[in-house]
Amino acid sequence: MKIGFWPRLSAIASLGILMLLSFNLQPVVAQVPNIPDTDRPLDAPPLLEPPEDLLDRTNPALPSNEIDSPDETLVFTVNCYLIEGSTVFSQAALAEVVAPFTGEVTYAEVLAARSAINQLYLDNGYLTTGAYIPEQTLADNTVVIEVVEGEVTEIEVTGLQRLNPGYVSSRIALATEKPLNVPQLQEALQLLQLDPLIATINADLAQGTQPGENILRLEVREADSFNAQVDLSNDRAISIGTFRRGISVTEGNLWGLGDRATLSYNNTDGSNVVDVSYRVPLSPRNTTLELRYLNGLNRIITEPFEELDIKSRSQYWEFNLRQPIVQTLNQELSLGLIFSHQAIETSILGVPFPLSDSADINGRTKVSALRFVQEWVYRSPQDAIALRSQFSWGVDWWDATINETTPDSRFWSWRGQFQYLRLLAPDTTIIFRSTVQRSDRALMGLEQLSAGGLGSIRGYPQDFLSSDNALTTTLEARLPIFRNSQHLLQIAPFFDWGTFSNNGDNPNPSPQNLASVGLGLAWQGGENLFARLDWGIPLVDANIERDRTWQSQGLYFTVGISF
């Protein structure tokens, strides 16, 4: 029996669909504070609205079966269906879908088998894929159903000024592999919308010249990639002056590659630090390489040591390769490999002099290390969780310090960080964060974990003590007391605690435990102004020298403006 089931092109469901994917994403406003980390701060991305609320998409209706066909009352035998062209589903899965339409069937039931294949693709998000029944002669009572899987053959990007169009198209292309899955494409567009270089994306998916072919047109508006910030804080050690003045300038798209360059300068009465970094994307999967260089000069300004002109010069180099493994709208898992090298030289009255057991006779200390980093961030409209793990192996590269008995560049340590945020009500949050460090031997001061002051245990001076092993925790609530469209004022009661110990011949710090309670006052003025004042009350006596600095009284402040 010969049957003519030639479809018109318009009868292939979704082979020529036109859909608008226009949207303007607005992240949920929930500020996730950074986990304190002197090596590599962890910034949690903004929380997102549920994906189904972010994208307005209209699905076209399935076409009617108005094709030239035999008498629909004609009955014939179909033992099986041969589905050709499908790369998504197994033959067993397809056979199960069309099984109800075997045996003694009518032409209408054969069309229903084709529609069942179409529906299977639609239900799984393959909206531009269609099935049809070609003209054929029934052999062995087998009906052939052809599947034309949809694909994007061209991505057109318009509207960009400085950003390379390939930055956008290469990332979206990862979600347009054949067969095209529209929900996956939507999620890729939403993820790209979160990129700080992108302000808005309008997407249009249109029919190509051949069945199954589609053209994706993207109209992109760039975000402002330049940022500058000035801030003041008393977050430095008393010995070099607590009052810090800082300025930083960042260009997030320096050469149009999505490459980020940052230059910052900070100083106190006894210190000057210049920090330069450059990060460039290496692949559409957001592989990045970051290079960082830091140069600092510190001078002791507290009595009676000021007269001795005690100075330290430091240089720090870092090479950071980072690769996200999982990226979705509500979580990210990434791995990183870091090589760092730090060199410090100390002197008294201009003469090189060792100020630690690890330094050589010329006061030089050098540490080289390989670090393996794992980061995981999860966020929802109500919660955010951030985890960071870092394994560090000290190596004797780049003329690193090697000693017989005292701590040197050969070591192993692990540092873990955890942060949890819960949004209880608008602008009302509770935050818990913790940092732990363990090492296999006595460490040089450069690798120890410091505690005290902002970002650690408030109520004690900044960097009050350091140790090889440590555990610190903070519990803080943020409660609004005044807010309007431009300003938000919050109080922040907190509790900080930590315990510390050393390895080998390094004596344990005294005291080994620190704890404090206190109250913070945080103000946010629009998007550019911020200020915070914290007052910490130490619960463990630590023989703190009470001088005229705010820090020695347990008071800490930060004021800043960005533009």
Feature annotation, model-predicted:
Residues T288-R441:
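Transmembrane beta-strand segments of outer-membrane beta-barrel domains in Gram-negative
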Residues F226-A228, W255-A261, P284-L289, N298-R299, ...:
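Repeated loop/turn-to-beta-strand initiation elements of outer-membrane beta-barrel proteins
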Residues A203, F226-R236, I247-E251, L257-D269, ...:
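Transmembrane beta-strand segments that form the barrel wall of outer-membrane beta-barrel proteins
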Residues K2-G4, A30-R236, T242, I247-S248, ...:
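Periplasmic polypeptide-binding modules associated with outer-membrane biogenesis and secretion
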Residues E251-W255, S277-P284, R322-T328, R371-Q382, ...:
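Outer-membrane beta-barrel proteins
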Residues N234-R236, N253, Y265-D269, Y293-R299, ...:
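Transmembrane beta-strands of outer-membrane beta-barrel pores
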